[in-house]
Each structure stands twice: as structure tokens, then as C-alpha cells.
Amino acid sequence: MPWIQLKINTSGKVAEQLGDTMIESGAVSVTFQDTHDTPVFEPLPGETRLWGDTDAIALYDAETDMNAVIAMLEQEPLLGVGFKHKIEQLEDKDWEREWMDNFHPMQFGKRLWICPSWREIPDPSAVNVMLDPGLAFGTGTHPTTSLCLQWLDGLDLEGKTIIDFGCGSGILAIAALKLGAARAIGIDIDPQAIQASRDNAQRNGVSERLELYLPKDQPADLSADVVVANILAGPLRELAPLISDLPKAGGHLGLSGVLSTQADGVAEAYADKFTLDPVAEREEWCRITGQRHTS
């Protein structure tokens, strides 16, 4: 069905209050969007952090009397009479089909492809991971996931054990298994991520070689030849003592989820136990890799 979209520019300080008023006026949903595409990263737990200059965007049923909606919103002290706004009629589309049409197989490195299940596999002789977007992060489209997949493709994983710390969809652990790893261990704080990883591993025929744990359940003596953690800079710094002990002597470490401006701070937290490689960058994100000291 078609929808009517109402966009109002406001400030981050009052955006949520305005959103509540838009819901009261009959909106079926309200979203907030940065007017200038400025990213916001790592809000504190329980915090909804918004931009200084924010667009509040509400959707209304196509039959809604928008004159009545505007009249109601003009009573809101935050807006007042004659406030600036933009109303658009949204085209009725098969949004699911349009979304699926825009998701294509992607190649990472020389051997590895990530393919949605509804697309034909471009190279049957390659290492193909079948993965559809779902509840947890990680389909290969984000620069940090891409950086980690390319790194894994360049390693000799034959017979190795890998730990995917913050496994999300399981994409990194599953890719490692299909690239030759003998065993993978996925750890995540989100039970939905654990389930998504389990489902994706089964779809790719590697579930028997993938172990999945919530942090409270993980064995105390975990170690691996390769450890990858694609989370965020804050947790990578805070958890450095734990993550640093996971790779075996001579083992490989890959860290991402880090902005290029945060790379030095994260690298410093691992420099005492690892010989670090030059930082790899993509867009505004980076990947930090290294090898654990043998003594």
C-alpha cells in the first residue's frame, strides 16, 4: 500500500519528543536521520544518541488527512504555526523484492565469495558461503566485515582452529571453515546472534565443526591459531587482556570494527604481545592484524 511521508528538521535534543507527538498525530512509524550524514558510534548502554541537526521522518497511511496532522503539530510548542516540513507520497513497491534485487554475490580476496541463496553462484569452483541478511550483523557489505573476510582469505587456514569473537551472523567463522579451518569457535553476547550463526552454519554444511558460546558459557582454556574480533574500538580496548590471550604463540590476530582515527589507541592495547602489521583501511574503517610473540 502507498504511504505518506512527513519530514521535519529539528535538533537532536528534542527529536524524540517530536517523534512522540508525530505518533500521537497518527504516524505508524517515526525514524530519525542525520541531516548531514554524520555517523554516530558507540553510544553508552541505554543511551539514544542523536545528531545535532536531525530529520524526524514519519509515515502515515495514504488516507490520512495531512492538513489535520499539520494543524495538530502546529500546536506543539517545539514547532509552532507555519513550521517547515516536507510531505511526499511514497510509491507502492514490492519492497522485499526490491531489497533482494539489490543484494548480489560478493568476492573477497582470491577464493572467497559470499552469495545470497536466491542468486546463482558466479564461480562454483570457488569457496562459496551462502548467507542471507538476517537478525545479526555480518553479510559482507560493511567495510569491516569485508576487511576481515579478505584477511581470512589470505591466510593458510588448513587444519587450523579459529575463534570468532563477537560472531554476529557467524560469517567469519563459517568462511574460515570453508577456507580449510578444522574447527571454529564463535562467541557473542547476543543469543540471537548465536542462533543466527547456528542456522547459517547448518545452511553451509559446517555446523559440526562450529562451537558457539555466550561469554558466560565459554570454556576457560580457549585458544586458537587464528582469532578475529570484528566488534568496536571501545570493547576491543577494554577486552584486550582477554582477547590477547586467545591466540596461541605464533598465532594470528585480526581486529576490526575500528575507525581509522581509533586505530592507534586499539593497536597500543595489543602491541606488547603482538608484532603488528601495517593498518589496512577501507573508507573510514580499518583492520589491525598481527602475530603473537613466541616468547
Curated annotation (Swiss-Prot):
Gene3D superfamilies on file: Vaccinia Virus protein VP39
Keywords assigned: Cytoplasm, Methyltransferase, S-adenosyl-L-methionine, Transferase
One term of GO molecular function: protein-lysine N-methyltransferase activity
GO cellular component: cytosol
Enzyme Commission identifier(s): 2.1.1.-
Pfam families: PrmA
HAMAP family: Methyltr_PrmA (MF_00735)
Name this protein carries in UniProt: Ribosomal protein L11 methyltransferase
Species per Swiss-Prot/TrEMBL record: Pectobacterium atrosepticum (strain SCRI 1043 / ATCC BAA-672) (Erwinia carotovora subsp. atroseptica)
The gene coding this protein: prmA
